[in-house]
Design a protein with these regions (language model features):
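Non-catalytic positions within long, well-ordered alpha-helices that form the structural scaffold/packing
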Residues: 28, 95, 144-145, 214, ...
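Hydrophobic residues within beta-strands of alpha/beta enzymes
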Residues: 35-37, 102, 152, 193, ...
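Residues that line or immediately flank small-molecule/substrate-binding pockets and catalytic motifs
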Residues: 39, 106, 156, 225, ...
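Residue-level recognition of the N-termini of beta-strands and the immediately preceding loop/turn
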Residues: 71-73, 150, 251
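A metal-dependent hydrolase metal-coordination microenvironment
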Residues: 1-134, 138, 229-232
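A structural motif
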Residues: 32, 99, 148-149, 218, ...
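Domain-core and long-helix interface of multi-subunit machines
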Residues: 12-14, 106-218
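Charged catalytic cores and adjacent phosphate/nucleic-acid-binding surfaces used
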Residues: 1-6, 10, 20, 25, ...
Length: 265
């Protein structure tokens, strides 16, 4: 079993604190074969922060020097909320170093709904929760139509936060056709999807959507758990591989210079 972990945040993300070198050592201790760092970057309009690409590269090189060839390391990013300003997102990425992997993600509600990060959004009733899902899907469609990323990150991610806030009855089932169309576009553009193991707290997306993606012809799939804390590194990856097998996948991907490398499940 080849264990690759392709969604990992270091201190290069504003919401994480651990150096890349320390994460590499922890990944090695956890029995992983490969990790890809995917720290947050967003168009400046989202959070007003610049990206210090030189610092990112320096941090990555320090990790490489610390770990040597004991584990394979790749450098990627999680590009968040590009639909807020596609031109700014393209300008941001034009200045990036050569990256192995780009996760395209939606984290925030649109400015029309307050622009709040969904982590902080607390609906007061089911209708507000579903409005959040509709807002998310509208942005996701724009993101996938744009397509300038490697894989789509954590499809159905609003459920992660809703469930933690007690809205466990809310689902994406009423939007099956919208999700199907998004997946068709993703496949047509030659992009992939992430299985985010969600630190073992219920995968995003779940089995229904993984099977839909596979039945539509989707093959490009990566695994990661979106960890921001050292104790969670690698969590759920083995179980994620089993879930992919159950959903009809025979292989999963890692990426080098944004080209897929296939691994048997």
């Amino acid at each position: 079993m080849y264990l690759a972990y392709c969604h990992l945040h270091s201190r290069m993300s504003a919401d994480a604190e651990v150096p890349m070198a320390e994460l590499a050592k922890l990944a090695l201790d956890a029995g992983l074969d490969e990790v890809c760092y995917t720290d947050h970057v967003e168009p400046k309009v989202v959070f007003g922060a610049e990206v210090d690409w030189e610092a990112v590269v320096s941090e990555f090189e320090s990790a490489q020097n610390a770990i040597g060839d004991r584990i394979k390391l790749h450098l990627g990013v999680e590009l968040g909320d590009a639909p807020w300003d596609f031109e700014a997102a393209e300008s941001l990425m034009a200045n990036a170093p050569e990256l192995d992997f780009i996760i395209g993600s939606i984290h925030c509600l649109t400015p029309e709904l307050g622009g709040m990060n969904m982590y902080n959004y607390v609906p007061t009733n089911d209708r507000e929760a579903y409005l959040g899902i509709e807002d998310y899907l509208s942005q996701l469609k724009k993101l996938v139509d744009w397509g300038k990323f490697t894989v789509l990150g954590h499809l159905t991610v609003p459920l992660r936060y809703y469930f933690r806030k007690g809205f466990k009855q809310v689902s994406f089932d009423p939007y099956e056709e919208e999700v199907r169309e998004i997946l068709r576009t993703l496949i047509h553009k030659g992009r992939g999807m992430e299985l985010n193991t969600n630190l073992g707290d219920g995968p995003v997306p779940g089995a229904k959507w993984l099977r839909m993606y596979r039945e539509l012809g989707g093959e490009i799939i990566t695994l990661g758990s979106d960890t921001h804390k050292p104790e969670a590194i690698g969590k759920g990856i083995r179980e994620g591989q089993q879930l992919l097998r159950e959903c009809g996948f025979k292989q999963f991907c890692t990426f080098e210079k944004q080209q897929p490398i296939w691994h048997t499940l």
